[in-house]
Every structure is written in C-alpha cells, then in structure tokens.
Amino acid sequence: NPKPYLSFPLRTPTGYSANDASVGDMDGDGIYEIVIHLTGRAKDNSQKGETDPPVFQCYKLDGTFLWEINLGKNIREGAHYTQFMVYDLDGDGKAEIAMKTADGSIDGKGIVIGDSTKNFRNEQGYILSGPEYLTVFDGQTGAALSTVLYDPPRYPDNLFPSTDQLKSLWGDGYGNRMDRFLACVAYLDGVHPSLVMCRGYYT
C-alpha cells in the first residue's frame, strides 16, 4: 500500500537539519513544490553567540532539486529571525519567495546581494547594525528579482544605531525584542496580494 506521505533525500549541508517548510507552485504546472529552511547552529534572540547562515532549498515533490538560497553571516539563525513567504505575489501563476536578506546573502543563481565582504556580527554574535534588505526571489530559479531596504528598520534613518538608541526604541539594546519577526500575505485592497512584514515583540 502507498504510504500517506512523500519521502525523498535532501541535500542537507553538514551540520544542518530540516526545519520549517512551506509549499507553493513555483513553476506554474499546478503541482506544489516544497521550500525547506535548513538550520545549523542557531540561537534564540536572548542568547549570545554566532550562528550558522540560514539556508533555504526548493524541491519538486519527486525530489528534484531546484535551488538553494544562503542568507549569509549577516542574518542570524534562530526561530524568530527569518519569516519566509511563499506566494504568487505578481499574479503570473508562479509563486515567489520573499524574506529578509543582508550583505552577503546568495541567491539561487549564486549571485551575491550587497557586499559579501561585510561582517556586522558584534563580539557577542548579535547583528545590530548594517543594511537590512527585503528580497523577492523567483520561485522557479531562486534568482533575486527585487531587493529593497527592509521596513520597519532597527532605528529611523540610522543603519548603525547605538545601544542606547536601540534601548530607547525597543526596550533593550541587544535585539531580543527588535529582532523578532512576523510576516503574512494579505489582500489589503481586496484584489491584490500584499506582503506584510512585522518586527518587534513585547515593546
């Protein structure tokens, strides 16, 4: 008898394991593909320490590998940091994937977003400064389609806020509240899908 699930091997990087997942029709053939968030060394927002870069892979349901996106060292890995939305945002019948990116993120074509030489991790492993981006990727190829500055920012009009500035805005100066994210897709005008990105708990 057929099993009530699908099973196929992943191209899991050493030290990583499968974590969150989402589905969408990436190529417009009417059949879902699956996007898997692969996590290595991760930290809660309240915990010090460096993490491994978040990795995303896309597969067809027969196990065919489509692409890999590596968010790089300037995106911290943990349960609250990366919210990824898989949805047909432009109405062409193919889903895109959208998420927060940073200098050194690598798209599914191997193209670097921003400046790969930058390292914004502080001595405690937190990332509290530097540019933050929102990127929409092509769901079929993983190629970056559009990258803009992430909104809401850590601090208005300042990519390098001080600890005191962060504390005044968020209630702490190390990102425990500031760097907890949520996201959704909503039909705000009743017709077109909009990407909604949220930032900050507890404040």
Regions inferred by a protein language model and the residue ranges of each:
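Beta-propeller-forming repeat regions
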Residues: N1-T203
